[in-house]
Swiss-Prot record:
This is 5-oxoprolinase subunit B. The gene is pxpB. One of its GO terms (molecular function) is 5-oxoprolinase (ATP-hydrolyzing) activity. It is an enzyme of class 3 (hydrolase). The keyword Coiled coil does not apply.
């Protein structure tokens, strides 16, 4: 059993955080726990993260300590959730103006730009959780050969649709924002559109594959 610790954060929330390692199996149990918590009357929101879950309480002043005890027990009882997974292909133009850090990643990894693209697009990724921005997917299973530290100095503006690598993870920026990930490409696919019936394109558990476009490195 993977050990966990619970603690208060701010004035309204409790966090359950797992010890390393980060695995898809433990992430599936976090999804199940979040699903269980969201229907409870004293829970405002249950937010799954990477190896953790944050629970916002309706009456924290009277429930927080009890919630810590119960969260620990519920984690020990939780089972994996196999969500209804969709397979989504994301077209990407690698390199060029939309992927200004492709050469940096290639140099760091000792690969050619073409090899970086081939590796990055060869994997079927899983959406572990959404965060940072509405619809920003944190994707697991980035090949270890592509792990690259974030930029020492974040950019003041990263365009929407930018595909990046940050340490052991890869993802796509749904909206323009400051950001520190290494940008290797750009997609025209909209990951967040408030005008859609479902504004957020991806959900935890979805499978994603990046498809190189002929306009870029491929």
């Amino acid at each position: 059993m993977q050990r966990a610790r619970c603690y208060l954060i701010g004035e309204t929330a409790v966090v359950l955080e797992l010890e390393p390692p980060v695995t898809l199996a433990s992430q599936k149990r976090i999804w199940r726990l979040a699903q269980r918590l969201v229907d409870m009357p004293n829970v405002v929101e249950a937010i799954p993260g990477m190896n953790n879950i944050t629970v916002i309480l309706r009456n924290p002043e009277s429930l927080a300590l009890d919630a810590i005890e119960r969260l620990q027990r519920w984690w020990e009882e939780s089972e994996a959730l196999e969500p209804e997974s969709r397979f989504i292909e994301i077209p990407v133009v690698y390199g060029g103006a939309g992927g200004p850090d492709l050469a940096v990643v290639a140099a760091h990894c000792g690969l050619s730009e073409k090899q970086v693209v081939e590796l990055h697009s060869s994997v079927e990724y899983v959406v572990w959780f959404l965060g940072f921005q509405p619809g920003f997917p944190y994707l697991g299973s980035l090949p270890e050969q592509l792990h690259t530290p974030r930029r020492a100095e974040p950019r003041l503006l990263v365009p929407a649709g930018s595909v990046g690598i940050g340490g052991p993870q890869t993802g796509v920026y749904p909206l323009a924002t400051p950001g520190g990930w290494q940008l290797i490409g750009h997609t025209s696919l909209s990951l967040f559109d408030p005008a859609r019936d479902e504004p957020i394109l991806l959900r935890p558990g979805d499978s994603v594959r990046f498809v190189p476009q002929k306009e870029g490195v491929c």
